[in-house]
Every structure is written in C-alpha cells, then in structure tokens.
C-alpha cells in the first residue's frame, strides 16, 4: 500500500556475569591416594565483590562411588548465599609441573545451585594416569587444581538511545562467508567426485588448508588436470564433514565415536591438524572397555600420540575387562606390537603402585 512505512526498534538487556578463578594446592598429595581417604575439602572461598556467596571444592581421590573408583572426582559446592538459587557455570583444570593447564573440563550449561548442593565430574582424571606420571602431575608432591566460576548476576535494560547494536565478530563472518561459497558452489574452479556425486570447490581454499591438495595442484599431478578429480578413499558423509571443516574450521557432526573413527584417517591423510585434534578429543571422551582396543589401533595408524597415550592408560587401568572383549582378542592377531605396548604400559603402572610399599619396607630394615 502506498504510503506504508516500516518502523524498526530494538532494545538491549544486559545480564551481569561475575567471574573468578580459585587455585587449590594440596601438599603431600600422594598420601591421600590410599583407599582410606574418602574426600578432601578446600578452604572456603568467595568472590571479592560477593562475600555473602561462599563456595568450596571437594576432591575424592578414590572416586565418589563404585563406578568412579578408578578416577579422581571433583565438585564445586555452594556453602552459603543470601539469595538462592545461584546460577553459575564452572570449569576445572590441573596445573602440571611445567605450569601448564591440563585436563580442562567445563560445564557448558548454566547450573542451578541450592545451598549445600554440588556439581562437578565424578570421572575427572584416571588414578592410574596420575600414579604413573607423578613427577608431571605432582611436582614436589603438590597437586594443584583450579576452578573458574561464572556467576549469573542482575539483569537490567538499557535505554535504546544510549546503546548501539553490537558488531558481529568478524571471524564468524569470515567462516560464514566461506561456508556459503562451499554450500552454494559460488565461483568454483575445480570439481571433486566422491561416491558418484560431484562437488564444486575452490583450488585456493583447498590448497591453503590442506598440504595434500596443495601438492596436488602445485605439482600438476594427474589428478589436478582431470575434471572432476576423483576422491576414491572417502565415504560421502566423511567427505562432507572434512570439506565443511576446510571451509569453516567447524565439524558440527563430529560428536559420536563412530563418526570420529571415520573422520580421523581422512584428517590424517589430508594433513588437517585441527580436524585431527577434534577427532582425538571426541575419541578420548568416548573411551570405554568396548572401544579401547579399536581406539588404540586408530591412534597408532594415524600417528596421534595423545590419543594413543590415553588409550594405553585406560587399558592399563581396565586391563581385566578390556582383555575379555572381542576387539582386544582381534588385536592380538592384527596388531601384536600394540598388545606388547599395552603390557609395557600396564607393567609401568603396576610399578608405580608398588613403589611406596618398596620404600616403606626398605625403611624398616
């Protein structure tokens, strides 16, 4: 209709978030690792600006229950607050002997704390991993754990005339734009054939992100002269996840053990270090008695030392259970050198368990 006008308005609501970090160092920590030690409680702490909200950390050296007996469990507990509940997010990590942040675990969703309620991780760190690397985790027999807490505070509105719209993060804009080039096949200059499907792509982006594609185009290999370039060794879903990462740095479907198992070899073959790290993280978090042997094989085949170390440590802790699985029995035949490495890791862990007793006996002579 002539004369119609569109009016736009916007508002701004600010949610205050208070953040603080608490470092807790426990001396002579090796003495807490015996079966008799149920839990250790930190000193009470609070945010400087909110003294009325008091917290503490609780650490269980032998786990909090039967299921977590092979792990250290750690929790954040609300001790007191003028108003309840308290809404907060939190993150735990360890400081190793090099002063580095290790084993970061965070809660991504806001948690609701009532007084004396606690939230945390009952499988925070494998006891066997700690005992077999005591010099790294316990410098001078001191264990340092850190907790970052983000507390949701007051909510208030700001007048429209005093606020301008926020500017979108340019890094996100870049990945969105590159993703659009891929999704909509805009201005492409090469074609990839995967499982009978053709995909238009950009040589410059492929070469910049993957040394394998770069070598292919630089050296004018046979594949670079063909159109389309046939990719023989990738499943269609794996290819799409890999290409999505190449263009955007994201892998939105990489959350299951099976998907990570399929994507890891592709990431290794095409030199996508960032994608390998994402796969390692998923596989580490999904380690279980059932998956341990297969994960160890994958780590060995694709040169992922962190994942291999985690798998060996897990197998050392759960040796009896893992050795009964069909995957382990199959590995005896297909990858005997990994079985030997697993036994070596188990022997090292056992030596660490026995070491305090040996010292005790020698002191009694």
From Swiss-Prot:
Family from the record: Belongs to the Tdpoz family.
UniProt-recorded name of the protein: TD and POZ domain-containing protein 3
Residue ranges annotated for the MATH domain, each copy included: 19-149
UniProt-listed SMART domains: BTB (SM00225), MATH (SM00061)
GO biological process: protein catabolic process
PROSITE patterns assigned to the protein according to its UniProt record, in alphabetical order: BTB (PS50097), MATH (PS50144)
Domain BTB: 188-250
Coiled coil: none
């Amino acid at each position: 209709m002539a004369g119609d006008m569109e009016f736009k308005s916007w508002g701004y609501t600010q949610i205050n978030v208070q953040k603080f970090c608490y470092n807790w160092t426990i001396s002579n920590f090796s003495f807490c690792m015996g079966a008799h030690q149920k839990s250790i409680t930190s000193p009470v702490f609070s945010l400087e600006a909110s003294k009325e909200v008091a917290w503490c950390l609780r650490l269980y050296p032998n786990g909090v229950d039967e299921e977590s007996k092979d792990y250290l469990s750690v929790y954040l507990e609300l001790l007191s607050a003028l108003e309840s509940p308290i809404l907060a997010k939190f993150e735990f990590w360890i400081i190793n002997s090099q002063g580095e942040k290790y084993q970061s675990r965070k809660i991504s969703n806001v948690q609701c704390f009532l007084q004396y309620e606690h939230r945390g991780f009952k499988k925070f760190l494998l006891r066997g991993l700690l005992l077999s690397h005591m010099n790294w985790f316990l410098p001078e027999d001191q264990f340092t754990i850190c907790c970052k807490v983000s507390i949701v505070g007051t909510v208030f509105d700001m007048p429209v005339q005093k606020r301008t719209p926020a500017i979108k993060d340019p890094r996100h804009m870049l990945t969105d734009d590159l993703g659009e080039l891929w999704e909509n096949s805009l201005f492409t200059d090469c074609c990839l054939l995967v499982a009978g499907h053709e995909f238009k792509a950009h040589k410059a982006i492929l070469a910049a992100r993957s040394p394998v594609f770069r070598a292919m185009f630089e050296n004018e290999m046979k594949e670079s002269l063909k159109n389309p370039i046939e990719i023989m060794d990738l499943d269609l879903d794996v290819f799409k996840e890999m290409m999505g990462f190449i263009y955007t740095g994201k892998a939105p479907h990489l959350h299951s053990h099976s998907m990570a198992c399929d994507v890891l070899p592709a990431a290794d073959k095409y030199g996508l270090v960032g994608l390998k790290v994402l796969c390692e993280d998923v596989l580490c978090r999904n380690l279980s008695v059932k998956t341990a042997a297969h994960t160890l094989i994958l780590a060995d085949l694709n040169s992922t030392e962190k994942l291999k170390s985690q798998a060996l440590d897990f197998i050392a802790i759960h040796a009896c259970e893992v050795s009964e699985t069909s995957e382990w029995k199959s590995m005896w035949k297909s990858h005997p050198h990994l079985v030997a490495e697993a036994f070596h890791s188990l022997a090292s862990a056992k030596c660490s368990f026995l070491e305090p007793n040996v010292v005790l006996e020698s002191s009694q002579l």
